[in-house]
Curated annotation (Swiss-Prot):
SUPFAM superfamilies: P-loop containing nucleoside triphosphate hydrolases (SSF52540). One of its GO terms (molecular function) is pantothenate kinase activity. Belongs to the prokaryotic pantothenate kinase family. It catalyses: (R)-pantothenate + ATP = (R)-4'-phosphopantothenate + ADP + H(+). This is Pantothenate kinase. The keyword Protease does not apply. InterPro entries: P-loop_NTPase (IPR027417), PanK (IPR004566), PRK/URK (IPR006083). It is found in: Cytoplasm. CDD domains: PanK. One of its GO terms (biological process) is coenzyme A biosynthetic process. The keyword Aminoacyl-tRNA synthetase does not apply. Keywords: ATP-binding, Coenzyme A biosynthesis, Cytoplasm, Kinase, Nucleotide-binding, Transferase. GO terms for cellular component: cytoplasm.
Amino acid sequence: MSNKDQILTSPYLQFNRSQWAALRDSVPMTLTEGEIARLKGINEDLSLEEVAEIYLPLSRLLNFYISSNLRRQAVLEQFLGTNGQRIPYIISIAGSVAVGKSTTARVLQALLSRWPEHRRVELITTDGFLHPNAVLKERNLMKKKGFPQSYDMHRLVKFVSDIKSGVPNVTAPVYSHLIYDVIPDGDKVVNQPDILILEGLNVLQSGMDYPHDPHHVFVSDFVDFSIYVDAPEDLLQRWYINRFLKFREGAFTDPDSYFHHYAKLSEDEAVNIATQLWKEINWLNLKENILPTRERASLIMTKSANHAVDCVRLRK
């Protein structure tokens, strides 16, 4: 099959970086270099160019989709003769550990909140819906943190369902990477946003991913637009190790850090432990549970070196 035939039969439209960047049209840059610096992750070089060429076209596309969704809601209200409330638009962001999901989520939150049509954009990570460490230890799942069985899926689905139903003041648990656990009584309140961005490893998973916990409704059932942040496995491993080394010099030095004992490691020891953690936990989770969900996404962003996106695939 030729490349042309593959494109015609693919469920995705594919764009290289320059083709995607051209779709920005006249959308203005609304972030300063200082704001971008505060949005980037510990392991990334996020530039004005990256925001302009990748994220501004994406924010333009999302604004079109959101506006179309609002028109559809208006049609339904006209048909029913009601004046209902606005239903939040839910965007999910999935991908491997260390790929940069959180940065993508923060940049989109900042850009979308600057569109006049939808000022209130909330960001929630699914880490908060992990079972507390006490439960994971009881179930012998501490080395499976991030795997499907480590999440309180009933609570996560209830949260997303409530948001989509327009329920006010919905609470979401908050996770601390410092203590490596859910914060007791640290819930965040989400009150009827225009847009909810939901970021996490598991937001594209469905029933077949949870044979141990059968239920019929999933997060993906409530999502309006889903993004998968992708990268080659060798880069993911390198980024994970580099991030671990930076944490060793930063967050791990805090005496309250769950991983404080790693701060005393030599660089070689730290690289060896990070490599082991990657292979035994994160790579395994990627292969078994995360990567198989990639083709369920509305849009796939593929990164190359330096976290630069060089390919975008958009579902037709």
